[in-house]
Structures are given as structure tokens and as C-alpha cells.
From Swiss-Prot:
Residue ranges of every copy of the ABC transporter domain listed in the record: 354-590
Gene Ontology molecular function terms on file: ABC-type oligopeptide transporter activity; ATP binding; ATP hydrolysis activity; ATPase-coupled lipid transmembrane transporter activity
Gene3D superfamilies: ABC transporter type 1, transmembrane domain, P-loop containing nucleotide triphosphate hydrolases
Gene this chain is encoded by: msbA
Identification of the protein by name: ATP-dependent lipid A-core flippase
Annotated InterPro entries: AAA+_ATPase (IPR003593), ABC1_TM_dom (IPR011527), ABC1_TM_sf (IPR036640), ABC_transporter-like_ATP-bd (IPR003439), ABC_transporter-like_CS (IPR017871), ABC_transpr_lipidA (IPR011917), P-loop_NTPase (IPR027417), Type_1_exporter (IPR039421)
Originating species: Pseudomonas fluorescens (strain Pf0-1)
PANTHER family: ATP-BINDING CASSETTE SUB-FAMILY B MEMBER 10, MITOCHONDRIAL, ATP-DEPENDENT PERMEASE MDL1, MITOCHONDRIAL
Cell location: Cell inner membrane
Keyword Nucleotide-binding: yes
Record keywords: ATP-binding, Cell inner membrane, Cell membrane, Lipid transport, Membrane, Nucleotide-binding, Translocase, Transmembrane, Transmembrane helix, Transport
Transmembrane segments: 27-47, 83-103, 174-194, 267-287
Domain notes: In MsbA the ATP-binding domain (NBD) and the transmembrane domain (TMD) are fused.
Amino acid sequence: MTDSSPAASPSSLKIYFRLLGYVRPYISLFLISIVGFLIFASTQPMLGYILKYFVDGLSNPEAVLFPTVPYLRDLQLLQAVPLLIILIAAWQGLGSYLGNYFLAKVSLGLVHDLRVQLFNNLLVLPNRYFDKHNSGHLISRITFNVTMVTGAATDAIKVVIREGMTVIFLFASLLFMNWKLTLVMVAILPLIAVMVRTASKKFRKQSKKIQLAMGDVTHVASETIQGYRVVRSFGGEAYEEKRFLDASQGNTDKQLRMTRTGAIYTPLLQLVIYSAMAILMFLVLYLRGDASAGDMVAYITLAGLLPKPIRQLSEVSSTIQKGVAGAESIFEQLDVEPEVDTGTVERDSVSGRLDVRNLSFTYPGTERQVLDDISFSVEPGQMVALVGRSGSGKSTLANLIPRFYHHDKGEILIDGVEVEQYKLLNLRRHIAQVTQHVTLFSDTVANNIAYGDLAGAPREDIEKAARDAYAMDFIAQLPEGLDTQVGENGVLLSGGQRQRLAIARALLKNAPLLILDEATSALDTESERHIQAALDQVMKGRTTLVIAHRLSTIEKADLILVMDQGRIVERGTHDDLLAQNGYYARLNAMGLDAPAEDIA
């Protein structure tokens, strides 16, 4: 993942307003919270006025507080001040509850919506996006970055609204009491604004670095956990310890830099505010005039209440910039154009005829042509095998048929219709695919077979698919049979067992086109014998594209395409190609059962 340049980065305000756009579904709750914070903020000046009455009451406790108000004209300061303090506290508590609770509902709902949208977005992004971004950074966005957004959407909004309104109420009261003295406080606002702006830029820049560093930590941990067998088998513990230590230390250093910025910035801001307070107190004493002691105490009290909300408003800049940096990376992903689907054709069924005409392909962002002028045809029910060394383009060709990538030139037709013209979901319903990299989910055996569109399939159909894949023999020995949990990515199963479940999933789909990408490469000899028998049966009536390096699979193909450097260099049946004594014959002489890197 790369950083956007500062010049290209959208402004913090624009990002934050976009983030707040997610508040719209909760606008009524948001308005209630604002009313609550208004109530809370209004109580701050009241405390200053209470002190005024208290000080004035020291010299005349029997003075009447509301001489012109009916029913209250006999209420003396002696009774009024304690009563008002209790009422103000209750009023403040009500405001605090309404503000905090309803804003929390808004903020948590906002973050939930954002997290769900981010995850759903991952499901529709094109394959090339996953090719360019490692899984650690993608996971970090959903976990760590969204957590940063939570801070900006909860604590930050609360502080901005509550403390911002408090500052407004206090300034309004100070202006009302003595506008000339209040101008002294106003004079420092430009300096405070400059300090906040400078610190905000630093906080945002550092926050982006922290989130990238956290993505590195997640990536290293994820790779090590997923590949723990390789780590232990090859003695990689020390290497992985060093790699994780470096990633974690980098994240720690960046966190400390941000903490240091805040540790310097906050005391400097406090020094400016309290310097203004010192000047203000001098002027209050020097220019007392005819004001009473209560007036002076009230004014100083209200002025003394200002530094706390101003300081909190300045400190919230760090939280906001963390959230803005997190939101920027989230919106960067959300703004990526999803997988393009311009197709209009939908068919309930297809016969499975496959025609590839003059197909060429280059991966986006690269210059090397992976496929060059590929042409062949497969009749319904036929089996075609792709053979060639690693990197010859076999898997790329297989991935273009279900439109995991969009081809540059040429055509791929299913039943005479270009695959780009099919609606994406409809196209993929007609294709079943099994690869050497089996993906199982942390769920039951049955749910892994009946996955996605297959969910809800009758139990007997699931059992039949498992039997046809020769998986029922080991499933029957599991503690709960089909209802046994397989663990993360099927960790509780052997490689052959995992592969058979993947094949059972493809069998249950019952699609007319079948793509087997090294589908038996992870199986032992006994397992392969069972699977091969099952595949022989299931391939009847289905168009099958097989990428394989085992002779037992290839020799039964109706057509073998021999690929090298993205081109078809030979084609024909097994016997025909051997008779030609060419490239395929040399591969066969090397042993088609050799390791995949030699021939696949």
C-alpha cells in the first residue's frame, strides 16, 4: 500500500464531513444528543452566577434573589443558593446523559455501518486489487483503522460539541458581564488557532504512518500463523521473531513520535491560555471600578472555567486526525471501482461449448504478455488438458473463463456468447472450479460443501456429492460426521481430505463447465485413485478444463494443449503428441509425474 502524496490527499475537513455523512440515518438521535450537550454547556455559566450570589450573600444573606417573580419574591439568598446548586446539578446530569448516551448510539451505529460496508466492499473488488494489497493491510483497515474512526466518531464529536458549546456559553457570559475585559481573552484566539492547525497536520501525517505500520504488524503475524508448519519445519522461528520485532518496533517508534508531539503541544497551549488568564486577573484587579465583589468573583470564575474546555478541544485534534487518517484509507478502498459487470445475458442453463479465439492477455500494470493469440474449441462434454512449465499461462487462461480478470484481445465464448456479455453471477453459476490451493471455512463439513449459493441444499445431495468425491469414508469417522467443525481453513483435516471436500463442493454445484487446476496434486496415491474414479464419472456430460501434471489425468483428455511462454506450441491427443516427438514428448520423457515446477 502506498501513501498518497500530501498534495493529492483530500483535506481533513472534506474527509471528516464525508465521515459524518454516515450520521444521516441516525439524525434524530444525533439531534437529541446535541440538545443534551446544549443543556450541559448551559450549566457552566450558571455556576459562575451562583458564586456571584454566594459572595454577595455573605454580606447580606437575607437579600431576595427574585424580588419581581411571583411565589419567589420571598426567597432569600440563604435558601436560594443551595437550592439552585442542586437544580443545576440535576439539569447538568440530564444533559450529560442525553448527550453521551444518544451520541454513543449514533457513533457506534456509524462505525458498524462503515465496517460492514468496508467488508462488503471487499467482496466485490476486482482480483487485481487483492494482487496489489497484502491481506494484513486489508484486515488492519477493518480492525485497527475502523477503531481509529471510532475515536473520531465518538470521543472527538462529544468533546467538540460539548466543550465547544461550553466555550461559546462562557464567552457569551463574559461578554455580557464585561466585554472590554473579554477582548483580552479573544486576542489569543488567533495564536491558539495557528497552534492547533500546525499540530493537526503533524498528527494526521503521523497517524497515517502508524496505521501503515500496524498493517505491517498484522501482515507478519497473519503470514506466520498461516504458515506455522513451514516456519517450524525450516527453522524460521528466529527469522520470524526478527521480522515481527522490526514491524512492532517500527509501530512503537511511530506511536512515540505522536505521543511526543502531543506532550510538547499541550503544555505550550496551556502556557498561552494561562498567560492570558494572568493578564486578565491583573486587569480585573486594576480596573475594578464599581463592580461588586460578587461580580469580580463570578467573572474570574467563568474565565477560569475556559482553559479546561479549550485544552480538551485542542487535545481532540490528535483523535480527530487519527480518525481522519483511518477514514482516508477506508474511503480510498471504498472509492475503488468494484468488479465491472456490463453483461446483460442470463441463461438458466448452458450446454458447455467453449470457444477461445485469438485470446491475448496482459496483467494490469505490467507489460509482459502472459497469453498470446490463444485459440481452441471444446465441444460439450469434452475434456481438454493444459500442460506446460510453471508460468506458461495455464492458470491465467483458466482464470479468464469465469472473468476473474478481463482479457485484452480476442474472445472467450460459452455456447457462442462472449463471457463479457453474461451477467457475472449468472456466468459463474455455470462454472465450477477446484484449485490446488483449497479454501475451507471455519464451519462444519456440510456447510463447507454446501457453500454460498449451495447453502440450504438437501442433506441427501450433500451426502451424494461427498460419496462421489470419495469423502464419506473419512467423514463417517469424524466425531460428528458432516456436522464436524473443520477448523480454520480445514486445519483439522489432511491435505487429501481437504481436497476431496473441495471437489465435493464442485460436484454439488453440478455446473456444466468444470475447471480443475492441479485438483489432484495434493493427494496421495490412494486418494488420487479414488478421486480419479470420481472425476471420470463426474466429467461425463461436462466440459472440463484440466490443468494437471500427472499422466493418469492427462492421457484421458480429448485434447491436450501444450503451452510455453503464453502460447500454444502443440495440440492433440496423448498418442498424437507422443508420435510428433516434440515438446510434449520431451515433457513426457522427463516424467509427467515430476514436480510441478518442472512441467506445470
